Amino acid sequence: ALDYVINIHNPKRIAFRDKTLAILEADMNINTDVKLKYSHKKKSVSNSYKRFKGEIKGLNKLNAIAAKQDLEKKFTEAALNSSPHSEKYGDIIFKLEKLYKEKEKYSMARAYFLEFMYYSGPDMMNFAVGFRPIVGQLSSHSENTVEVDKAVARLKLKSKNYFKNLHLPTEKKLFAQLLQVYYENVDKSLHGKAFDLLEGKYKMDYKKFTNYIYSKTSFVNQEKCTNILNNMNESTAIALKKDVGYQVMNSIATAYYEMVKPRQAEYANDIEQLSKYYVEGLQILLPNEKKYY
């Protein structure tokens, strides 16, 4: 787990945010309007960016990976040399390493999904994803109108800041370049249908694909979005499903919720169970050793 954090998870998320910050800084340096609009986003992206870097620095300073590996080696040797405990504890480290390796592609897909959709990606995706539960409720003929009304109210409030700070040239750069990062780093088996049009008609031309999406979607048109939110019903939900911006967002989100999140949860549960045995075994076999869980 430490090796994953230091050498894979944090560096990948840092690289993603590097891309976001580079785009924002370049546009902010030449346009005071962009500087005003995106100062909060830049600060938000920078905060976790620094935290990810700090975690790597701190763990490396502690030589945490080597210490953890040394403890695991001692544990396995002690287990294998103790006949009452060899069967229960002897292969725990091997099993844990195998699970972490298998879980890796799902963990990284989750990380890229969160970065692209919520934390440091294009604002249009972050805005559009708020419509997903509303469309789901209305499409299923749900009678839970209270929840729909609450979600619509939240989006109306959010839309004010969203459109106030939206600068399309910057937004389109974020979408094109970060979509490419997502595509190239998330395992293709977990892409879902999000990239069919990009791979087919647009032949992996991210700029042309982006121009198409932003020229057709209602999510960058304040008047259209206001009208949608003021008239949210089943017919509106059906129409939103045909919006190209919604389709990109929804296909990425559907791939995550159907293919990534369940598998990651399964691996997390298996790892938790084995980790309990590992901690139990440490107390029995190496009671005086400093622990690195």
Walk through the language-model features, giving the residues of each.
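Terminal presequence/propeptide segments associated with secretion/organelle targeting
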Residues: 1-292
